């Protein structure tokens, strides 16, 4: 019994720390990242089981999931970095908020990614 609790103690410690120290917006982004992993995994599993007959469709969908995952990780990193910088120093605020800039970059890059994904469908 004690060996099982010894195995799960670090995991429960990480989960507790994550729940206490992570704000809601980052948790929402993490949930979206999990969703993208599940959707990409389902698409890849479907391609393995059934086949990739419309290969453009498979590539477009799978690469769209992977690309959106990468873009979202970059967005999360930008938000985390801005939180660390804002808590450590009090600099003069720029014209555009770093949070707004990160969100606009996320939106623009997502639009470009999905524009190319839809065009690749043929």
Curated annotation (Swiss-Prot):
GO CC, one annotated term: cytosol
Recorded superkingdom: Eukaryota
Residues that span the membrane, as ranges: 31-51, 55-75, 102-122
Segments on the Cytoplasmic side according to the record's topology features: 1-30, 76-101
GO biological processes: protein N-linked glycosylation
Keyword Membrane: yes
UniProt topological domain (Lumenal) ranges: 52-54
Keyword Transmembrane assigned: yes
Lipid bilayer topology: Multi-pass membrane protein
Pathway(s) per entry: Protein modification; protein glycosylation
InterPro entries with a match to the protein in the record: DAD/Ost2
Keywords recorded for this protein, A-Z: Endoplasmic reticulum, Membrane, Transmembrane, Transmembrane helix
Localization of this protein: Endoplasmic reticulum membrane
One Pfam family per UniProt: DAD
PANTHER family in the cross-refs: DOLICHYL-DIPHOSPHOOLIGOSACCHARIDE--PROTEIN GLYCOSYLTRANSFERASE SUBUNIT DAD1
Similarity remark: Belongs to the DAD/OST2 family.
Role played: Subunit of the oligosaccharyl transferase (OST) complex that catalyzes the initial transfer of a defined glycan (Glc(3)Man(9)GlcNAc(2) in eukaryotes) from the lipid carrier dolichol-pyrophosphate to an asparagine residue within an Asn-X-Ser/Thr consensus motif in nascent polypeptide chains, the first step in protein N-glycosylation. N-glycosylation occurs cotranslationally and the complex associates with the Sec61 complex at the channel-forming translocon complex that mediates protein translocation across the endoplasmic reticulum (ER). All subunits are required for a maximal enzyme activity.
Assembly behavior: Component of the oligosaccharyltransferase (OST) complex.
Listed name of the protein: Probable dolichyl-diphosphooligosaccharide--protein glycosyltransferase subunit ost2
């Amino acid at each position: 019994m004690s060996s099982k609790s010894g195995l799960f103690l670090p995991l429960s410690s990480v989960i507790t720390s994550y729940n206490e120290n992570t704000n809601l917006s980052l948790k929402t982004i993490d949930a979206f990242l999990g969703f993208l992993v599940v959707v990409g995994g389902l698409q890849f599993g479907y391609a393995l089981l059934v086949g990739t007959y419309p290969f453009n469709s498979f590539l477009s969908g799978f690469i769209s999931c992977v690309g959106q995952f990468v873009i979202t990780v970059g967005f999360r990193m930008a938000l985390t970095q801005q939180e660390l910088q804002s808590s450590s120093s009090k600099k003069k605020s720029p014209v555009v908020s770093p949070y707004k800039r990160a969100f606009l970059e996320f939106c623009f890059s997502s639009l470009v990614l999905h524009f190319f994904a839809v065009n690749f469908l043929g």
